[in-house]
Amino acid sequence: IREAQGKGLIDKAPSFTSTFRYLENSDLTPILKALIEQSASPLQSVEANFAADSSGFATSVYDRWFDHKYGKMRSEAKWIKAHVMCGVTTNIVTSAEVTATETADAPQLPALLERTTQRFDVREVLADKAYSSIRNLHIIDAVGAKPYIPFKSNATGNGHGHKVDGLWNYMLAYYNFNRGEFLTHYHKRSNVESTFSMIKAKFGASVRAKTPVAQINEVLCKILCHNIC
């Protein structure tokens, strides 16, 4: 910023704390999400297969508690979790959500997929077992895409205690009896892990912000920078 001021590109260099003050504004969150989605748009003609996953970012805020067993205070850094959907060809993030670390992955998939389908023709959705549910299978099928989500070891034809579901049973049979073909598609899911590795390698695996809103916005900024860099 000081360099930009020296070159006459801006009249006044703002305080280095200005960015952190803006990050604390909750109105910035939907704007950052929209920018992430818009920045992915130029790759509409390239991406058709998408992977979903989540990853944690460490904060500088700590939980502290007294350990009665050992008679001393203990502390542990709090984490926040980024949920993303990305194209498996270019690693572009097409939608993102940031939540508390204990938030489950499966309920995040519908919104990630819905926002991705606003700009992309989705043909395949890849995700790990954490996303396995009847609801997610039907949501993916409803947009004309095929789900490649492995089943948990205790999965049965009755859909985890629910009434018999045709799509669940079809995909379970496909997974069990066409495992090789399933895996040729599913292996592309590893690209979402590569996406998180790229983001953390370039922009850091932790956040400096102290407040929850600012932490969410800081992670969204990392994802946005990944898309445009």
Per-region residue spans from a language model:
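Helix-centered, glycine/charged polyanion-binding patches within enzymatic domains
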Residues: 130, 134-201
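Polybasic low-complexity intrinsically disordered regions
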Residues: 12, 16-144, 223
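Catalytic-loop motifs flanking and including active-site residues across diverse enzymes
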Residues: 108, 191, 195, 220
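DNA-recognition alpha helix
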Residues: 1-9
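Residue-level detection of the helix-turn-helix DNA-binding "recognition helix"
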Residues: 2, 24, 28, 229
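Charge-patterned, long linear interaction tracts outside catalytic cores
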Residues: 198-229
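Residue-level "edge-of-site" marker
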Residues: 17, 153, 213
